[in-house]
């Protein structure tokens, strides 16, 4: 593998002894060795397999789902740093980010697209200044995420995605599609708003796929 991810306490072994063993066997060397941090409990105690004080990941995944656990760890803990795990923090992150922010955006958008246009958005458009900031953020997001992921800054990439999610929820409140839907003369404007919402969800789903592959399809 080009990149080896190892615990920070064994970086010396994996950057001196392990490469020497690979060279002796004429096997390819890793191009990068990245030392990740420790997972701690709320009181600062390190989780350790040898101490037998780890949280069972199978139990967590059965209860909350693999994607939710993966999201929590990558969002909550900057890669390379030590991170704290508590059940309270996990539940709060799932409820706040996944259920409230993303879940509500998805629910509201799909419901309005179905209610006003039967699930098929018409081609007519009427743009407004309210659209510009959202469009710019969505347009720039891919490059920002690519840069963060390339540097293994997964938490930063997810933070950028959630900035767009928050801005999109605000956009709904600003444009008030439920008001536009009552005025037939505003149909083109309503179509533009719903299209922008759907386009943001499309972009977000693509960028979240590496983090939540079972959820985004």
Language-model segments: residues:
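Helix-rich, typically C-terminal accessory recognition domains appended to large enzymatic cores
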Residues: 76, 89-127, 137-217
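Alpha-helical recognition segments enriched in aromatics with Gly/Pro capping
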Residues: 1-88
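Gly/Thr-rich phosphate-binding loop signature of adenosyl cofactor/nucleotide-binding cores
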Residues: 132
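Short helix-capping and inter-helix turn/linker motifs at the boundaries of alpha-helical repeat units
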Residues: 48, 135-136
């Amino acid at each position: 593998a080009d990149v080896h991810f190892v615990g920070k306490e064994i970086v010396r072994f994996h950057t001196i002894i392990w490469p020497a063993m690979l060279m002796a066997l004429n096997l390819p060397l890793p191009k990068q060795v990245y030392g990740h941090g420790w997972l701690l409990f709320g009181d600062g105690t390190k989780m350790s397999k040898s101490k037998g004080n780890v949280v069972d990941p199978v139990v967590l995944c059965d209860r909350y789902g693999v994607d939710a656990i993966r999201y929590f760890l990558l969002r909550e803990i900057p890669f390379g740093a030590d991170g704290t795990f508590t059940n309270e923090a996990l539940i709060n992150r799932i409820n706040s980010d996944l259920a409230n922010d993303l879940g509500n955006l998805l629910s509201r958008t799909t419901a309005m697209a179905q209610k006003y246009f039967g699930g098929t958005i018409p081609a007519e458009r009427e743009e407004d200044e309210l659209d510009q900031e959202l469009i710019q953020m969505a347009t720039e997001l891919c490059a920002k995420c690519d840069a963060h992921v390339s540097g293994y800054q997964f938490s930063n990439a997810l933070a950028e995605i959630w900035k767009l999610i928050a801005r999109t929820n605000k956009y709904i409140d600003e444009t008030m599609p439920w008001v536009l839907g009552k005025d037939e003369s505003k149909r083109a404007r309503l179509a533009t708003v719903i299209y922008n919402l759907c386009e943001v969800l499309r972009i977000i789903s693509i960028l979240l796929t590496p983090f939540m592959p079972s959820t985004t399809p």
